[in-house]
Amino acid sequence: MNKVEAGNELGFRVGFSGHGGHLRVEPFYTAERDDALNSLPDFVSPPAFAKETKESIKKHIEEKYLIPRLEPDQFSAEKAENQWDFDWFSRVKMPLQPSLPRSVVVPTWELPFRRQKEDTENGAWEPKSVEVDLSEQMYGDQDSGFFPRMVGPPKDFLRGSVNNRPFRPGGLEDSQSSERVLPEGVSSGQWVQELLNGGPAQTVPPSFKQSLDLGDLMPYPQTWSVYEDHSSHGNASDENSSKLSIQFDDLFKKAWEEDTFSELEGDDHTAGSESPKAEAEPDAKASISNEVSKGLETDVTVLDEILSSAKTAIMSEEAVTGSSDKQLRKEGWATKGDSQDIADRFYELVPDMAIEFPFELDNFQKEAICCLEKGESVFVAAHTSAGKTVVAEYAFALATKHCTRAVYTAPIKTISNQKYRDFCGKFDVGLLTGDVSIRPEASCLIMTTEILRSMLYRGADIIRDIEWVIFDEVHYVNDVERGVVWEEVIIMLPRHINFVLLSATVPNTFEFADWIGRTKQKEIRVTGTTKRPVPLEHCLFYSGELYKVCENEVFLSKGIKDAKDSQKKKNSNAVSVAPKQQMGSSAHQDGSKSQKHEAHSRGKQNKHSSVKDVGKSSYSGNSQNNGAFRRSAASNWLLLINKLSKMSLLPVVVFCFSKNYCDRCADALTGTDLTSSSEKSEIRVFCDKAFSRLKGSDRNLPQVLRLQSLLHRGIGVHHAGLLPIVKEVVEMLFCRGVIKVLFSTETFAMGVNAPARTVVFDALRKFDGKEFRQLLPGEYTQMAGRAGRRGLDKTGTVVVMCRDEVPDESDLRRVIVGSATRLESQFRLTYIMILHLLRVEELKVEDMLKRSFAEFHAQKKLPEKQQLLMIKRSLPTKHIECIKGEPAIEDYYDMYMEANEYNNKMSEAVMQSPYAQSFLVQGRVVVMKSGMGIDNLLGIVLKGPSNTNRQYVVLVIKSEIPPPEKNMVSIGKKSSDPSQGYFIAPKSKRGFEEEFYTKPSSRKGPVVIKIELPYHGVAAGVGYEVKGFDNKEFLCICDSKIKIDQVRLLEDGNKAAFSQTVQQLLDLKSDGNKFPPALDPVKDLKLKDAELVETYYKWTNLLQKMSMNKCHGCVKLEEHMKLAREIKKHKTDLKDLEFQMSDEALLQMPAFQGRIDVLKNIGCIDDDLVVQIKGRVACEMNSGEELICTVCLFENQFEELEPEEAVAIMSAFVFQQKNTSAPTLTPKLAKAKQRLYDTAIRLGELQAQYNLQIDPEEYAQENLKFGLVEVVYEWAKGTPFAEICELTDVPEGLIVRTIVRLDETCREFKNAAAIMGNSALHKKMDAASNAIKRDIVFAASLYVTGV
């Protein structure tokens, strides 16, 4: 139904309501009036006034304006900041009434209608109505993000406008959505209170930068008086205390009456008074009431106090408990139901289906349909051809039944066109893509995801009508370039829209669904199946035979073994051939390999073939090499095709990972004919009918004639380099079954519904634009899923070509039965996203970052972190009581930590140097870092590192005395045989250990550590410890060295030996607080690195400061250091938790700050982050890099260019291929090209200046590609398409794609010119668009027009 207009020209869309019946338009009869003149609307007649004189006017001005009076009920401090409702022109205000509408829209309810389950007991049923707040309708314009705002102009209904604000995204908390940033001084009302107390009048309102210019009124005295006029303001006060909520059918009655505006607050108070929550907490009401009533007049009634307190109590209670209770209830937003139970009771649960299907539904389809009937969002994960589209069709049917809209989004234009053709016969369908808009008023719209994103950002009114959004191929979110679009759309969709997500099987389906549910605050039902409708068999094709390696998802190692045996047998036979034949065979294989490698990259000098070369390959090169390639490729493919044909496994799709290689393989089969005479006739008739819409010259394009020749023989080619109409012909003929062999790139597997009997992989490696790599399991599964036609084949066959060798079993197993690629966030900030979000009050850029899939896990843990933060804040604070007065332990601890950082920087380099290694021998005195945060430890090296233990064994002196049970010797054969080591003999009979002496034995060989490390003990009144240390734990190397007995220390664990060693260490101390002199890292250890030398001197100075601190050497140093560390750790933990919960912890926050600075520098936003005219222009740029396009327009770089030249330069914004032949440009075009490139370099340098990871040269080369400037220039001048193809080596399909996208860029530049007010640029872009829109480039899609 078209738009219905009321008499006052108020735009209205039928889909705004949504109900189960239908609407009709009936005449609205008005009352007859006696006088024809009185039949005119009241607002036409001018109001009558008394005759005015100069004296009366002067008197009125003085009384009305020069002696202002403040009314307490109107200008109170509590109300002043909310609304200044002063009627400056009351004398001319007349009660106006709009003219009555000519017609009215009324709902018609017809049986049978659906009853909701909860209404069945009552017997009576009434349709649901939507309550609309008229205050939002009247005052909420396009600046509001709420739905009850006035609709915009009809021309902006579908696409929206850059002047509109996006609708409020779903999932935002109420407190956040309604929060507004108020300027300082507004909320307090202090300045108004000063005014009421006799202060001077304020001329600068809060947040305003300029004051009011009073002009000639400045000399007048500013005297204020307060009075009350109950007769004139009493009624207004009563009227303002009410609020009216009306139903849908009231919208077209007397909506503009004055009493509507004066009754906007009553229902809120009434609703608040009826809440049982307010009555349950009288204490809360009393306290809140006191707070609310502060500053009010004493004559406030008890009823008003109760109402206001009740409302506040409800809000307070919900704010405190609502979010926490909801969080406790919703641990996970993704749920999985019992599909079997729903399947058994499906027809009981859904007795009246919105659409009937001619086949029995699968269980997952029934579960999804049941969820859709209940208005729930669903995520369906299933293999290719499993029947996911059934769920999308049911969503379309529900939207049609509910008189709402459904949107189907697809990742690529090809899928959109095909779905449009598939759904046209079933539903009211429209199509919206970048260059096509067909039936946009339809209830079911098919569009690309970018179009939907643009609608959301531009606040299109059609968003109100949408009930369902279907996301097809959701796994496309992993795409690096365009995956961010899916996340943006999901985040920006309003609350009333439900989701239908269709995806291939991925490991983290629940994780992704949980993110969507948590973001939108709605439950997502996850369903699907891992069962394939047609089971697959995976085989290897080697030496003319097929070897089965996988069946029913079970990998078969026997097939690999048989293929390997065949390879060994073939290689052994090859060894026995004559040397001459062997050399020839080797040369042939090497040539084949080199040609295969060459197929992945197209040479710059290759030009398009002429019309005369139709029968030959369209790619030039060495004829001898091409001939060798054809013979080799033809023999391989003929073997496989004949094998598949004998086994009735045709048609087959051969996936190659190069456009060039697809063409060469097809051309190699010049003598192969796979079609019958009837099929040839069908192909010929179809091609003639499809290509008849082209001009004569376009019908004879080399690509068109070459493809027709291949198609007649049952061979097809499908890749991005083909013309769009040629690709569609190939797809349609393949679906008809007349193409037997199709060579295609992987784009054919992305959503195109064209299953085959067999799928062949030419290789398991591909070039992804950066490197050659193995196929991912998800990519293999997506392409292999095209094998097997549901309802026609019992099994599908997947074949991997093996030419020279059989792949490894591990590689095959990983690709065939490995886990699919997880869904991962590709979210990234763009300038256009930032500019759009800065225009939205309800959603900040930080909120968008928080709601991205990349931040999902961090945001999910926020409640736990918040609880932990509250616990840590509630812990009692520890204090250090120093016996020497004011505690200096904090400074000492900070110096210790800083010295530790310096030491870590240089210790690794110093200790790993050969000079340090030569000093770290047994007996060397060292100082070790303490792991407990106390004073450093003096030690001695007992043993160096070995092959089995890379640590140094060091004895260190510790002040603490360990428990005696730790002093133990490891269980080992402790021999008392003197020949095995040192033994102990007493000096005298007193038996004291200090009088024992050592006696060397004759044992030789390395020392074996038999004591258990760490080994503790006490000697000479101090504790010691023996354990292993890494070289990073050495603080310094001392210049002292002690003789030690390794055997007695490490093997025997002799106490006398340890006592003697400890005593020698203690003797080395000149006093109790200092260590022996250390080796100088610079002089002794030959430290030469300048940075490390500087670090060393900083470290020594810090140690000197530490020694001068009064805590150094304190008896309580260890205890206080532990306390200082705990206090520091507590503060650090608090700061870390606060940081993790803040916006600064977001992954892309640094990039966001840098981009904000760039936008400020350019002038897109001001210092207050308000979007300026440059920013509004940048918001229009979707096809090109927004900064370059915006700066280019404001520098007026197209002023001196003709439309043909301007559109040629603009092709650099949309062209994507990197390596092309260099174009030949005119001097004018070359100058414009250089100027645009310099602009990009300048912008790249600016972004690098603000710490963005951008290289200026790469930035310019990535966003500006001038390979088609010459081609587009000639095309705009009217040159035939066949001739412009000769100017470049870019495939015809990419040329068409670039020109089509260029037309969209012209429209964007036209909109930008309108914003700028540049009429000359607007006309130039219009002329440029008309110059390129012609012939084959803009030929209509066969899916849209039919054949």
Curated annotation (Swiss-Prot):
SUPFAM superfamilies: P-loop containing nucleoside triphosphate hydrolases (SSF52540)
Annotated EC: 3.6.4.13
Changes seen on gene knockout: Dwarf phenotype.
InterPro entries: DEAD/DEAH_box_helicase_dom (IPR011545), Helicase_ATP-bd (IPR014001), Helicase_C-like (IPR001650), MTR4-like_stalk (IPR048392), MTR4_beta-barrel (IPR025696), P-loop_NTPase (IPR027417), RNA-DNA_Helicase (IPR050699), SKI2-like (IPR016438)
Catalytic activity: ATP + H2O = ADP + phosphate + H(+)
Region Disordered, annotated ranges: 263-291, 566-625
Domain Helicase ATP-binding: 369-524
Biological process annotations from GO: nuclear-transcribed mRNA catabolic process, 3'-5' exonucleolytic nonsense-mediated decay; positive regulation of wax biosynthetic process; post-transcriptional gene silencing; potassium ion transport; response to potassium ion; RNA fragment catabolic process
Basic and acidic residues bias (residue ranges): 267-284, 590-601
Keywords: ATP-binding, Cytoplasm, Helicase, Hydrolase, Nucleotide-binding, RNA-binding, Transcription, Transcription regulation
SMART domains reported for this sequence: DEXDc, DSHCT, HELICc
Role: Component of the SKI complex which is thought to be involved in exosome-mediated RNA decay and associates with transcriptionally active genes in a manner dependent on PAF1 complex (PAF1C). Involved in the regulation of potassium deprivation stress response.
Protein name: DExH-box ATP-dependent RNA helicase DExH11
Organism: Arabidopsis thaliana (Mouse-ear cress)
Gene field: SKI2
